[in-house]
Amino acid sequence: MTRLCWTALLILGTARAEVPDFATAQRFLETHCLECHDADTQKGKFRMDELTERLETADAFKNWSRIVARLEAGEMPPPKRDRPPQADAESLLAWGKTALAAEAKTRQAGERTRMRRLNRLEYENTVQDLLQVDVALKEMLPVDDRMEGFDTAAEALSISPVHVERYMEAADAALQAAMMRGPQPEVITKRFFYDHQKESNFLNQGRQVGMMVRRDGEVQFHAETGVDHPAILQQLASFTREHPGRYRVRVAARTLDAKGEQITFSVSQSSKKQRAGFKVLGWFDAPSDTPAVFEIETTFLRDESITLRPYRLNDMRRQRGLSQYPPQDGSAPVGIALGILWVEVEGPLTEAWPPAGHRALFGDVPMVPFKSLPDHLVTPGLMQQWRKGGTLTPSSAQPEADAERLLRSFLPRAYRRPVSDDDLAPYLEIVHGRLKRSECFEAAMLAAYRAVLCSPEFLFLVEAPGPLDDHALASRLSYFLSRTAPDDTLRQCADRGELHQPDVLKRETERLLASPRSKAFVNDFLDQWLHLRDINATQPDKLVFPEFYIEEGGKNFKEDGLILQSFVEESRLFFTDLLQNDTSLLQLIDSDWTYVNQRLASFYQMPPVAGSSLRRVSLPPGSQRGGVITQGSVLKVTANGTRTSPVVRGVWVLENILGRRPLPPPPDAGSIDPDTRGSTTIREQLAKHQSNESCASCHRQIDPPGFALESFDPAGQWREFYRTRDGVDEIKARRPQPKASTKQTLKGRDVLGPATFLPGLPVDATGSMLTGEKFNGPQEFKKLLLREPHIITRCLAGKLVTFATGRAVDAGDLLSLDAIAADAATHHHGLRALMHAVIRSNLFRHK
């Protein structure tokens, strides 16, 4: 039996093992451990001869946690030592996990009662839903700290005077956005053409004139000019200046002289201050010759507009031997080009009037014009509206009675539970005090609403120790699966006291998972678990990895925005597919399918597909892709842009796939400096690094996963050789090199100019697992990983529990996590089944 199989059977057998007394556990340590970990030897600076059955101290809890983890991982006893009988090892693990769980339970009334604050995303979503507004609030708030990789951890979500100040500003912004200030705006459909005089002036001057041609009102782009189309920007911005709000945007576009190809273009939301666009609304594929109309919805603030930009058009023209400067004499276009006929906007779009947010705040209280605009409303937009015909404000004939009625309706939804008179009293006091000072009804009510949105009951998830009551359970479930407060259906279940019933909890879980709002869970969970939020944190060296960049004009290059977005969307669609179809979560490790578009398929060297939309495809035979570990998103966030590190990628796999956290490096460990000359591989450097005995034990775990992924470069591409810019002579001495040329083709793409790198030393993706099994490359490594389905399932369960509850799991939770993983295993490790197992567990339903 291999050591890996022994380890897997050991873990599965732990659940069946009878829990021994401490004397039995102690005999195991004396027989198999004390030779290396007694008072005299203390290998790894770890001593076991003083261990007792009492785990009250932090050191004792940590030491027993370490023993359980290392025995479970197969790290101990060391490979050269005889394995203890499996039954004995199972008994020790059973004792250790039981003792750790018992100690964790005794702590429950102490450190585990910390209240969790809403993080920035949850605050924004909750306020937007409560007031039915589409206003950005997250960026107004301080960045949340993370713990165990998640920004939902209660211990990391502190609050400071700065937070309070920013919450007040955010509350004011949201409340003003919810207010109805005038009659319902007329829904206008307006079409903007490129024959506007300002556009004509623009096209007759400036350095980009040679790359764009206007013919019969259609502008034709022959290059990625980076132009932000000032006429469209100015015309549309002047429109949104008068009427900010939700709009439907349509763009009519086509590909000219296509010859079977189509041009992809992006639509971004932009403003005068950010002319290059700050939010990509979508990517679209312009069909050949006959225009198509593309439609999106977005919310425009004042003066905002859109930017249209062709994608990789320079490459397409160059591959056809075409210049980016077409004739300017009005003759037919030469070569492939993007034609934009018009841009149309429809809006502002409102479902009802007064808006839902206004009704939530002021109900049916009559609206009357201000006689004079109060100071808190003196803004350019409202001043202009007031001068044109007045700005409306709620006016109550019975302000105190209306205030109580409105607050009684608003407060339970804000608090996410029923409220008492005592809950209501401080807000009524705010209103009464303002009214006594002769402030208007609106100002008094907005002051009370702002206080609600900054109150601890709103900002924190209030949960008493022990089993969660139905309203606390509703909040935990909703913030887990929808990333916002409970909706009416869920809140009504809690009001009736039904949610704790297993069948009702399962039904509501299914409803939320089937809702479009579950996309918020997928996006945020993967952003944190897989580190997708760091996708823009590094930039691959453009001279070494030119495939990752696109030409913007001349010698200017920029990161390929479509490939970055495609990386992230591939991971999200992959996870969503598993979740919605209850497919085995083990396909997160390896699969024979993924999601790609034309750009991603080319980047992965897969059979071509057409268009910018991602779709599910089967991987070709022999593909090195499959599962999340070999997706471009994960490979990019685990590299620094210049080089890869087996240590970084290895730690990522251990922590996020296997749930094993290596010990921090000792102070004398030193660091590994990159060899930019390429004359020494990272494996050779690590071999020297491991000569430090205190480093070697951890690197035996860390390095193998990292070595398996060395066949992928910092941009996420497959490679057989390292790329280098320097040290050519030293490399040649070890491996003959081809001569550098002035033009080379990299995976189908021409890179113009002098060669900026040479193939370096060959990549070695071989390695040995801690348990002795050998592998060559990522595919063999993934097959070895899949021999530990329980560990993989338990790790993901722990990540979900941490994300959902705001509390990091530890060794005291291993028994509960083992039970969750075993439950999912009876349902073929289905991802949806795992979600249900997590939600019905005590870890989720208890504080």
Regions inferred by a protein language model and the residue ranges of each:
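Sec-dependent signal peptide recognition
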Residues: 1-9
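Boundary at the C-terminal end of the N-terminal hydrophobic targeting segment
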Residues: 15-19
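Low-complexity, glycine/serine/threonine/alanine-rich intrinsically disordered linker
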Residues: 20-41, 46, 59-66, 70-75, ...
